[in-house]
């Protein structure tokens, strides 16, 4: 098992948290730090570090009280900005929805939060997920974390409508993503 919390798999996070190897807050803080450090790659349209910490604190509190833990307690995720999340800007990467804050949860997000997951933020994508290069987002292209022979990576696209998901996973910015992949 890695000493870096952001290198752990979902199962390793879950099991390590349950075994007391680390707290859920430590996991959320590590992922929040990676999200902040990788801001230049533009994978997240909206960052929600407080949501990740809130879910982590709830998991730590439940564990301390001896309560049954939820399946995804302590696991931080990036949510594709295609899914509505109550009170959090949801744009589908479109200018038309730039100010939209849903008053409800999508079925996908509700199930994840009910399972104990914490949201690190909303992941960038092609506008309305209608693309294959992740270059049509109103909020700008996602920059690939890979470098071409040690050179500039700005011209590289992570590809797929879920480019933010692909980029953030490679850079240790979230352990799971919710969005289609090709």
State where each predicted segment sits.
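An N-terminal boundary/leader segment
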Residues: 1-47, 51-54
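Short glycine/serine-rich loop segments
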Residues: 104-182
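Long amphipathic alpha-helix in the N-terminal Rossmann-like dinucleotide-binding domain
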Residues: 50-57, 116-117, 126
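Enzymes and membrane/adaptor proteins characterized by extended Gly/Ser/Thr/Asp/Glu-rich
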Residues: 38-39, 71-108, 132
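Hydrophobic side-chain positions on well-ordered alpha-helices
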Residues: 13-17, 62, 168
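Conserved hydrophobic/aromatic pocket- or pore-lining residues that grip, position, or stack substrates
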Residues: 31, 52, 80, 112, ...
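Immediate post-signal peptide segment of exported/extracytoplasmic ligand-binding proteins
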Residues: 59-76
């Amino acid at each position: 098992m890695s000493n870096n919390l952001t290198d752990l798999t979902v199962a390793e996070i879950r099991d390590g948290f349950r075994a007391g190897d680390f707290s859920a807050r430590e996991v959320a803080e590590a992922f929040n730090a990676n999200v902040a450090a990788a801001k230049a790659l533009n994978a997240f349209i909206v960052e929600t570090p407080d949501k990740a910490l809130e879910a982590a604190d709830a998991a730590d509190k439940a564990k301390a009280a001896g309560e049954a833990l939820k399946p995804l307690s302590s696991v931080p995720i990036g949510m594709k900005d295609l899914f509505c999340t109550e009170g959090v800007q949801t744009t589908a990467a479109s200018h038309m929805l730039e100010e939209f804050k849903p008053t409800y949860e999508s079925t996908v997000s509700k199930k994840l939060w009910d399972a104990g997951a914490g949201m690190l933020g909303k992941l960038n994508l092609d506008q309305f997920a209608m693309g294959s290069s992740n270059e049509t987002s109103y909020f700008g292209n996602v920059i690939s974390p890979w470098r071409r022979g040690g050179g500039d990576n700005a011209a590289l696209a992570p590809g797929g409508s879920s480019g933010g998901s692909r980029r953030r996973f490679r850079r240790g910015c979230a352990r799971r993503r919710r969005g289609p992949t090709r």
